[in-house]
Amino acid sequence: MLDLLCPVCGETLVREERVWHCKNRHSFDVARSGYVNLLPPSASGKRHGDDKHMVAARTAFLSRGYYDHLIGAVAEACMQLAGPDACVLDAGCGEGTYTRAIYDALAAKGGRPQLLGADISAEAVKRAARQVPEGIFCVATTARLPLAAESLDLIVNIFSPFMAEEFRRVLKPGGYLLRVVPMEKHLIELKAVVYDHPYENPPFEPAAEGFRLMQTQALRTTITLSSNEDVQALFLMTPYYYKTGAEDQKKLAAVQSLRVTTEFLLAVYQPA
């Protein structure tokens, strides 16, 4: 059973219609799109994570199939790692594209997976809740998840902050953690357009305290972006956009197509 915990007192939350509440009478309304905000009180009222422009860009880009090879690999890995009725967390779920694929893959095994999507961006979680109405979605930080200890069979962590201690706390003994990270040459051609001195991503460090690495899978391919809209969407959905000055951002304005390297690593862990 996947139980949410109150971010104020830590007691179990119960849902009644459109409100989650605990026995200490702390209550949290469910938004019209289906998610609940469970950020700690100290973080309430602040804007966190991806903004609506970044979320819209990622939604548009992924809807065009450019990363379908990765989405398929994630879904296949989840089918191998989790049972049909597993309790699963998509930690840093974003707008829900991968979450949708994860749910469908597990449901295809004939069960009813309990899937929680958590992200610190309310804009992202809003879209995710609409994409996957079968799941539970909350605005939350992965540094302090509103979940009981040892409550999950599988954690999926895609391009999001990796919180080893917290993930270890909420994962069951014998459970699995699937982590997806970009490799060194990921999007190097995009960087070459924008930067005078394009740089590779740092090598992935597989060690994770409290976990043992079970297996890895590298996905390397090239994609051809067929319009300036897609080029801009890819750039906007990455962290590079907000780290890049206005003049360098303008360099993409004339690029109508671009062949880009994608390099991903899927790493599977179990609690040590």
What are these regions (language model features)?
Residues 1-48:
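N-terminal auxiliary segments of SAM/dcSAM-dependent transferases
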Residues 50-73, 77:
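Class I SAM-dependent methyltransferase Rossmann-like catalytic core
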Residues 87-89, 94-144:
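Class I SAM-dependent methyltransferase SAM/SAH-binding core
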Residues 143-154:
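A short acidic, Gly/Pro-enriched loop at the edge of an enzyme's catalytic core
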Residues 152-166, 181:
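A short SAM/SAH-binding and catalytic strip from SAM-dependent methyltransferases
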Residues 174-184:
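Conserved beta-strand signature within the Rossmann-like core of class I S-adenosyl-L-methionine
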Residues 191-210, 219-272:
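Conserved Class I S-adenosyl-L-methionine
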